[in-house]
A protein has these predicted regions:
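Conserved G1/Walker A P-loop phosphate-binding module
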Residues: 5-8, 12-104
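Conserved nucleotide-sensing/catalytic segment adjacent to the nucleotide-binding pocket
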Residues: 92-127
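Short, well-ordered secondary-structure micro-motifs
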Residues: 43, 107-108, 143-147
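Conserved C-terminal guanine-recognition region of P-loop GTPase G domains, centered on the G4
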Residues: 120-153
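Amphipathic alpha-helical transducer elements in NTP-driven molecular machines
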Residues: 83, 112-116, 143-144
Length: 153
């Protein structure tokens, strides 16, 4: 069984939790292939790639888990900046690519700049990139980083 999202309000604000649901990729085999710091890494076999992008902690990894119906497939954390490399998951006919978030992250300026270079390099060099899932936080107006990535897309 897959997982879906439930939005719950508590004393501290809103919380996104998972709940049983039908996940579109739940019946497919999904394998974690690896984490790569270089956007030029060539994946074999060459398959179309669907990338997940958005601010740090917007829910990219959680969405990937929900779509595949595998709660712990992509690592998630309440701490922004958990994903620091290009994390690759292979399905039978395509890859899901979990990218580092942009904006706030509990990392040094040097590391944040490296994450940004990885993401920008990924979008400008990947010939196998066929789709993008761009997550925006509806609680906030688009940031300067959101607008910059809009131009990149």
């Amino acid at each position: 069984m897959g997982y879906g999202f439930a939005l719950e309000q508590n004393a501290c604000g809103w919380k996104i939790t998972t709940r049983p649901a039908i996940a579109p990729f739940a019946e497919l085999s999904v394998d974690f292939i690896g984490s790569y710091p270089d956007p030029a890494t060539r994946l074999e076999p060459q398959l179309p790639e669907l990338a997940f992008i958005g601010r740090s902690n917007v829910g990219k990894s959680s969405l990937l888990n929900a779509l595949t119906g595998r709660k712990g497939l992509a690592r998630v954390s309440a701490t922004p900046g958990k994903t620091q490399t290009m994390n690759v998951f292979q399905l039978p006919e395509f890859y899901l690519i979990d990218l580092p978030g942009y904006g706030f992250a509990k990392a040094s300026k040097v590391n944040r700049a490296a994450y940004r270079r990885l993401v920008e390099g990924y979008f400008t060099r990947r010939e196998t990139l066929t789709g993008v899932v761009w997550l925006l936080d509806s609680r906030h107006d688009p940031s300067q980083d959101d607008l910059a990535f809009q131009q990149l897309l």
